[in-house]
Amino acid sequence: MIAIMWQFEVKAGSETEFEELYGVEGEWTTLNRHTRSYLGTSFLHDQNRSSRYIVIEYWSEMVVYEQHRVFRSDEIALLEERSRALVDAVEPLGIFTALDVPDRFGPTWSKRK
């Protein structure tokens, strides 16, 4: 399993729209769900700095993530354009390999309602 992390600095007044785009029912998460190897997303909001968010996507393997990016490149480009209008900065934090993955029970976080 891999985890891909980004940090976003969201423009003042754009927080709600940003949360709707990347949240559990958002278009970004919905697009990722089309790929079976997408395992879910952690969507974090900094308690001390209201403009800062962390997004962590979980995928079964890197090659599938890369194929998803190619296959859905047009849709991804449109969503990234919308995201750019809402943020001051995006910083990729890295791609991480899970060293110890606990057993999962129930649906992935991205599929919970």
Where in the sequence are the language-model features?
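Glycine-rich beta-strand-turn "strand-cap" elements at beta-sheet edges
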Residues: 2, 39-53, 77-113
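Short, well-ordered beta-strand segments in beta-rich or mixed alpha/beta enzyme
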Residues: 2-9, 39-71
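Generic structural motif
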Residues: 11-13, 62, 101
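An amphipathic, aromatic/His-enriched active-site/gating alpha helix that lines ligand/cofactor pockets
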Residues: 23-40, 58-96
